[in-house]
A protein has these predicted regions:
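Conserved alpha/beta-domain cores
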Residues: 2-135
Length: 135
């Protein structure tokens, strides 16, 4: 499958109707969002909904998961619960340093090893969204 996407469809991870209906638009990639579109009170339920979506109704396209940023209290729970589902990639928002990306890579690798997933199967897509990230 091509790694260039014409369409990347972002879906709030806490909205079952949108999760179910996302594939109807036939995007090249669906990104389940656990970050900005999900309130702090719904982070756990969003992880559960995305988990069930990928276990029981995985879309026929590339799948990414936008996790919470590296300094967030939700970050490690996002990574540890999503990597075993083997998305094509995790999207790291607000990446500001190489350390942010290295930290995520180490965590993903540990989880891949623990779950007998091929090392490097889950990729990282880092988003630069701040001035510090540009520098």
């Amino acid at each position: 499958m091509n790694s260039l996407y014409r369409t990347m469809f972002f879906v709030p991870g806490n909205d079952p109707k949108k999760i179910i209906g996302a594939e109807i638009y036939r995007p090249d990639c669906i990104i389940y969002d656990l970050e900005d579109s999900v309130s702090i009170f719904e982070k756990d339920s969003a992880r559960i909904l995305v988990k069930y979506a990928l276990q029981y109704n995985r879309p026929d396209c590339r799948v990414g998961i936008r996790i919470n940023q590296a300094d967030s209290p939700y970050y490690e729970d996002d990574v540890s619960s999503m990597v075993p589902l083997q998305p094509d990639f995790l999207r790291l928002p607000k990446a500001e340093t190489a350390e942010d990306i290295k930290k995520l890579d180490v965590l993903i690798t540990e989880i891949e090893e623990k779950h007998a997933i091929e090392i490097g199967a889950v990729k990282i897509v880092a988003s630069i969204e701040t001035a510090l990230g540009v520098v």
